[in-house]
Amino acid sequence: MLIADCLELMGFSDFYGNADVIHRLRDMLARNRFPHAVILAGPAGSGKYTLSLMLAKAMNCLSPILTEDLPDFCSKCSNCVRIAQAEDLDTRFTEAIEAREGLRETDKKETRLFVQTHPDVLVIPPDPPQMMIKVDQVRRVIETIYFRPGEAKERVYIFSDSAFMKEAANSLLKVLEEPPEFATIFLLADNPGALLPTIRSRSMICSLAALPAQEVEQYLAKYRPDWNSKQRALVARLSEGAVGRARSFDLAAYTAARSHALTILGSALRNIDHSELFKVTETYRAGAEGREKTEKLLRTLYSLLQDLTFLNSGTPELVRNTDIQADLKKLAESSDFNWIAFVSDRLNDVERGMRRNLLRSLSLDAFATAVEQEVPNR
């Protein structure tokens, strides 16, 4: 999934959390010892993309400043302003897809997705429908990286995902073996282990840690005053320490999906009337909107299963859906670890079915029937 923390960034002081990591990166900039390839690792919403753009600004700011005796950017010069236009990655990504859809069919197949709001800063997102970095995208990097920047001090390339097709990953290795002195490559990875070992060995890995829930709540108190304290506490736990994810969290959509998830699990565990279950599954239709809705439901089901695991293992303090803990306890009383593992496997089956374009409502009905048959002591 592609999410950017769309802040009006004024400097490194606006990056929330991971102060030691930011200090180390800025110190390397100050000493002109910044590596040519950096893997920014951390969970979705931890600020990897935001930080990569901040560093691109700091490298290329026309009126650089010092804060805390370390390099910072002005946010006002032409380079900073143009780089900032790439901050809303979701919107830029959608625009790129729409632009490609407007091409002739023969041109569509040969056109790869890029986001570029500054001539010397190129963002390379995963290319649909596989949502992976493709070899033609890496070839574009190879074609341009050895030319000196035209309007900036440093060419910057940002791969917004670590999912590379095999040929693309091998092509990237060639660049990493002999990078030019005036170019920097950022690889953003939820899991750096997904990258080839040879790519990792040629890059500096910089990890952004998840923040404590209390810090995320403090952040939300400032940036989401429309939420009450209980809502902020819930989102802080659900976002797993990622402030970008927390700030953009769609609470209404999540609670709607959670209501459906509870109906599905409750139907299986409590052996109740299935009419409500079928009313729920019938709403998951074909098409892009239905696919997104189903993906949210599956993520929510996984979240509830994790909470059931915490309750069954005697660690209720780890439960994330704290506002429905009473409902979860009732479900936990009827479940065990084997059943939870079985349900997780069946969710994987639904996901595989989605990739084969199976009818979602029927897949969910089959899922609910299967998990009911495995309920303990029935």
Where are these regions (language model features)?
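Clamp-loader machinery-focused feature within the broader ASCE/P-loop NTPase space
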Residues: L2-E167
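Charged, glycine-rich active-site and insertion segments that engage polyanionic ligands
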Residues: L7, G11-P71, R82, E181-T184, ...
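Catalytic P-loop NTPase motifs of RecA-like helicase/translocase cores
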Residues: F164-E167, P179, A194-L195
